[in-house]
Swiss-Prot record:
Sorted UniProt keywords: Iron, Metal-binding, Zinc
UniProt xrefs under PROSITE patterns: DNAJ_1, DNAJ_2, DPH_MB
UniProt: Zn(2+) binding residues: 134, 136, 156, 159
Name under which the protein is recorded: DPH4 homolog
């Protein structure tokens, strides 16, 4: 059990989509392509030894001061995060469960400042998204895909406010 909690702690500041550098609505091919690229960059067996030597020399004084020589551990940690993210997002069921978890975390993290009816939001057909102005001058944006996945809490892109979008599934 300790191992699984360690895995979740590794990725605690970034979600799996951020780790794989894809959007939350990315398709499996896009996710796979990004995973492969990142795996090649961070896999411990694929790392360029000369780059590691040069990096270790550059970080030598920091290691002495901090008594912390975990450069390789950082690369291994990055690769492990990438692997965990891929294993979750490549499986449809695990991805849906993970997306639900992200949504629940988002709801708990952000207190809802207002409830807005979807009909009051402007629909931007080009991006298939709904937009609503925030009092800070920026906007709340939610896509049709997010709505169909059950997402209803939207954070402003410019401040810490969030709204709950009221709508009925058709």
């Amino acid at each position: 059990m300790t191992n699984s909690s360690n895995n979740s702690n590794k990725c605690e500041n970034k979600n799996y989509y951020e780790i794989l550098k894809v959007s939350i609505d990315a398709d499996i091919e896009e996710i796979k392509k990004s995973y492969r690229k990142l795996a090649l960059l961070y896999h411990p067996d694929k790392l360029n030894k000369e780059e590691n030597i040069e990096e270790n020399i550059n970080n030598f004084s920091n290691c002495l001061v901090n008594n912390n020589n975990n450069n390789n551990n950082s690369n291994t940690k990055d690769f492990n995060d990438i692997q965990i993210a891929w294993e979750t997002l490549k499986d449809d069921l695990l991805r849906k469960q993970y997306d639900s978890l992200l949504l629940e975390q988002k709801r708990q993290k952000y207190s809802v400042s207002d409830e807005i009816d979807l009909d009051d939001m402007e629909f931007i057909e080009e991006n298939s998204e709904y937009v609503y102005p925030c009092r800070c001058g920026d906007h709340y944006i939610i896509t049709e895909d997010q709505l169909s996945e059950g997402s209803d809490v939207v954070c402003c892109s410019g401040c810490s406010l969030s709204i709950k979008v009221i709508y009925q599934m058709e």
